[in-house]
Amino acid sequence: MAYSYTEKKRIRKNFGKLPHVMDVPYLLAIQLDSYRKFTQADLSANKREDVGLHAAFRSVFPIVSYSGNAALEYVSYSLGKAAFDVNECILRGVTYAVPLRVKVRLIIYDRESANKAIKDIKEQEVYMGEIPLMTDNGTFVINGTERVIVSQLHRSPGVFFDHDKGKTHSSGKLLYSARIIPYRGSWLDFEFDPKDLLYVRIDRRRKLPATILLRALNYSSQEMLSMFFETSSFTLGKDGQFSYEVVPSRLRGDVATFDIKDDKGNIIVEEGRRITARHIRQLEKAGVDQMEVPSEYLLGRSLAKDIVDTRTGELLFECNTEITSDVLSKIVAAGVEKVETLYTNELDCGPFISETLRIDPTRTQLEALVEIYRMMRPGEPPTKESAEALFQNLFFSQERYDLSAVGRMKFNRRLGRETETGEGTLSNDDIVDVMKTLISIRNGKGVVDDIDHLGNRRVRSVGEMAENQFRVGLVRVERAVKERLSMAESEGLMPQDLINAKPVAAAVKEFFGSSQLSQFMDQNNPLSEITHKRRVFALGPGGLTRERAGFEVRDVHPTHYGRVCPIETPEGPNIGLINSLATYARTNNYGFLESPYRKVIEGKVTDQIEYLSAINESEYVIAQASASLDDNGRLTEELVSVRHQNEFTLKAPTDVQYMDVSARQVVSVAASLIPFLEHDDANRALMGSNMQRQAVPTLRSQKPLVGTGMERNVAADSGVCVVAKRGGVIDSVDAGRIVVKVHDAEVEAGDAGVDIYNLIKYTRSNQNTCINQRPIVSMGDIVSRGDILADGPSVDMGELALGQNMRIAFMPWNGYNFEDSILVSERVVQEDRFTTIHIQELTCIARDTKLGSEEITADIPNVGESALSKLDESGIVYIGAEVGGGDILVGKVTPKGETQLTPEEKLLRAIFGEKASDVKDTSLRVPSGTKGTVIDVQVFTRDGLEKDQRSLEIEKAQLDEVRKDLNEEFRIVETATFERLRAALVGQIVASGKGVKKGEALTHDILDGLEKDQWFKLRMNEDALNEQIDRAEEQLAERRKILDERFEDKKRKLSTGDDLAPGVLKIVKVYLAIKRRIQPGDKMAGRHGNKGVISVIMPVEDMPYDENGETVDIVLNPLGVPSRMNVGQVLEMHLGMAAKGLGVKINKLIQEQKAVADIRSFLEEIYNSTGDVAAKEDLVSFSDREVIDLAKNLVDGVPMATPVFDGAKEHEIKALLRLASLSDTGQTTLFDGRTGDQFSRSVTVGYMYMLKLNHLVDDKMHARSTGSYSLVTQQPLGGKAQFGGQRFGEMEVWALEAYGAAYTLQEMLTVKSDDVAGRTKMYKNIVDGDHRMEPGMPESFNVLVKEIRSLGINIELEQED
């Protein structure tokens, strides 16, 4: 197999047994693909598909004026260039966006001509605001902060049938309902009430009988009945008896009210007997099609058609009239020969529409329309036109109603139609078909839908949501344009004068800036970034709300398999509403989640991969990824465990149609990073995957000894590392940049063939952690495309590294690890294992105030020399200064209001020019409790103001950096060009040239003796060579010109002033780097949900040690394992111990300078001979140099990968422990560090990967002496941010009361809280060294008195003197 640059340096021993079928797809694809579809920036205007921006414009344009004499048509759009790149936008606090220009065509028609002749056409490009661009990592920079737009899981448009589970009516009767949900437009609900009448609701308003809707669609009563019912025919004979046309199947289950006979008079069913299937067969056999029935047989039935008197032609009875004996006698008297009745029965053909018609008050279409108008717009007087227009706009107008392609597909599928495409609006057939389906479900035929099925929920990603917002903006523009279009013809306006882009820009800005789904990116570490971008929210606009979401929505559903992770979801009120995409899941064109499967043909597994959505999946039989196969890929077991119709069953291999592609297909990225996940309880795995996202990047990242093999994918896809765009040779590398000379094969014509990667150094992340990239390549290394060149935060050698491998013992230790506390050795602090760097950004803003402008200066009133010692002459702190709480970072003074001066003061001021008292000190100071180093300062000055010394220095430094970059690029291009020329010229004959004899053959020495520009003056005998020389000269000149232009562009950006908010003159941003060591109170965790707080840091000499004198780093409580059932941590420790032991052995081989062959054979034994190795590592292809490099990287331990659900088995761990010459029990004898005594029994010791979580005691600890008070209650504020106090609540008061501690209680409720006079007096007393207190009246009593007065009760406190 081919190893990448970093894999060669450090191979992970993989325990996976299952074959590798499919690489993990690019993890950010869901974000990037969605937004790429939205902008279609890389496609030319005529090739754009009807999605995204293009679709939004197409749906709103053309806009036609009210008179119809002018129209505005959309032609195409183009995206401009971004003013600043991503990093500049973050620095300046602006949005990373590009201008959108739309080409529109204004057509004016001739009023006079009959056939709308075109009078005038004007075409113009119109600016339509800015569209935010997505960065390469799937984020947006909005106002300088990185944000993520998370995808939303919402109910798919279409039609859904459901019932109320018997909760509405006390009888527990199931009331069925149908709901048509469009993508945009009014909802249409049909529902049964307890009396089995069918009602309709529009937009959840009050209900109307469903037949009103049908009548509004222009159906008559008779048409309605014929659509929903079959009829029974009765013919009146000469003898006054009725003859019934028999449909035998309809009689089943009825009780015969008379003898039923065949043609010969034989009785088939006796009176009073129930008619069974056997009777029906006999009737069919006897060919009975007519049957004499008594007239009572017709009573209670309903007429299917209007009954008309044949003689007079008058209407006797309307259809749907119930037949009574009175009605029947009139029908007979009128001489009606044939009566048709509705066929209904109790079981499977209820009379619902017929009953509903009886309560329907309307008779004509207009009445029905008026009724609907009254329901939608109560209180408005209806007219015929307004009623018709309202109804037409509800479901039948393309502007107001759209099912969308998805909705139409789901709608047609649910109603069992052949086609999946159709109109976006509803048709009469659609509405009738939905009612028919609902009635058939009520009749017991068919099933209701499961709304939690992932076939009924679809994912809306960034692109789609941005398109919707954009359309909302365009619709607002449309209204304004329509008004102005009528003026366009008379005043000769251009398209630019018609369109005001503000509403579009506002809608887009609002969505990206403040939508519930546009979130501040979680940038703790690379994993949290990736997880945030792969989030699926059920909340948000158009989704659920926390309060309404029940248990079912939150629960794991069988269709989540391979689509949504069943493990990773937050604990707390959002559980189950925020999910994470499974590793291999993707969305299809309709927005439904799909999962990949391998095709199985007649028991043989192929390598063909197909994606199935939840809609299709249930019909297939799908085997697990772990099903055993023989060498030919055939399923070997007699019965295979499969999933079929959302259930797990066993089937024969020949029945299997698909098979999972991987064992980690089920879980998300975070869960797939937990080794031995299969041995952990689900609740703990949930905590484990959530806590990995909170790990803070440590000073020196360390790869996990026990991983899962996913670490490399996460690091590469997260975007925090520098990944080679093209293969090549490392030309130069330092801490800040890597220069790659690209392989000739990958260089395109006219391209420099140089890739320069500038590394990010010590930048602040959204969570104030530190982002820093370190190169891992050396000069001269050969890299290929996709290799990792530099590690980012929490990445080690191209692998995700969130924590540190710690030597851990499971034992109680003096109660210091009671209840999940953690005992840590001082060595961990000394070695800076969990030291993290946090970067804080502090901002000082100088504004223009009413009293004059604020000034940033080092001249601050009443501040001593020492306080100003760290500021330069501009009043800004030096880079590198060590500052602590209260130190001045930026000196700033603000004008004070003019006070009335005494004559003496005026005189003094006139003499000495004393102005210091006019300003007050409002400098930026370091917040209390913070200590750090200034690592960067940025100064932004308003355009038009003169820049101070400091900003000019910063600007110069930045320009030098750019110049250095460009020179480097030119140097490499130049070198490469001359190398190619040298290769072509050596040995060729010169025709003429300075410093060279004619007819001489060129050698390396001659060329070295020439100045570089003299090479271009050479003329050779061959014309082809002369052409090559000229072309090289042109290319270099062209390159130099391009680089100079880039430099000028950068210079222009830096030297122009900044676009600051109104009233702001200058902004200074100071970045502090704060080093946080680990300390008691910090939260730590493993990857299995085993979290705890550090209780104490013990000296190394007191920690338990083994017989070699090796102390443990951390002591954990063994009681934390059994009840929590996360045994994965114990297995991880054992395997970690083996990994470390093997590293020690390799180190010994290197120290003893053993032959390379010995090292190679030991590595062969580790990788290819120990355990059940599925895929062997190809160490034979490694050179001796590479083997030594590999061995040196394995000294700290041989990294292992135990993939989820396919991990290391117990016997393999034991084999590795034996290979490392360790006890295969995984237990060790330990000695007490304080006494030297051996502990009474052996202890489990091993290596576990521990994380330091972003819940640091420094951020939480807080103390208050005096501070600010709440205005009304006069009690101290709460919380660290407000510098608040601790609340002494009701229950605490009870505790003091229980102890009878009256004086303490008095102190708590008065001087320490809201007794204003008492606390001031107390403070004075303490200053004077007198510790007495005089409690007075608490302010809360006064508040109570005032509140009672507000009720109109006067209450006065009478105090005794």
From Swiss-Prot:
It comes from Cellvibrio japonicus (strain Ueda107). GO terms for biological process: DNA-templated transcription. GO terms for cellular component: DNA-directed RNA polymerase complex. It catalyses: RNA(n) + a ribonucleoside 5'-triphosphate = RNA(n+1) + diphosphate. InterPro entries: DNA-dir_RNA_pol_bsu_ext_1_sf, DNA-dir_RNA_pol_bsu_external_1, DNA-dir_RNA_pol_su2, DNA-dir_RNAP_su2_dom, DNA-dir_RNAP_su2_hyb_sf, RNA_pol_bsu_bac, RNA_pol_bsu_CS, RNA_pol_bsu_protrusion. The keyword RNA-binding does not apply. Its EC number is 2.7.7.6. Belongs to the RNA polymerase beta chain family. HAMAP family: RNApol_bact_RpoB. It comes from the Bacteria. GO terms for molecular function: DNA binding; DNA-directed RNA polymerase activity; ribonucleoside binding. DNA-dependent RNA polymerase catalyzes the transcription of DNA into RNA using the four ribonucleoside triphosphates as substrates. The lineage of its organism: Bacteria, Pseudomonadati, Pseudomonadota, Gammaproteobacteria, Cellvibrionales. Keywords: DNA-directed RNA polymerase, Nucleotidyltransferase, Transcription, Transferase. NCBIfam families: PRK00405.1, rpoB. The RNAP catalytic core consists of 2 alpha, 1 beta, 1 beta' and 1 omega subunit. When a sigma factor is associated with the core the holoenzyme is formed, which can initiate transcription. Pfam families: RNA_pol_Rpb2_1, RNA_pol_Rpb2_2, RNA_pol_Rpb2_3, RNA_pol_Rpb2_45, RNA_pol_Rpb2_6, RNA_pol_Rpb2_7. The keyword Nucleotidyltransferase applies. This is DNA-directed RNA polymerase subunit beta.
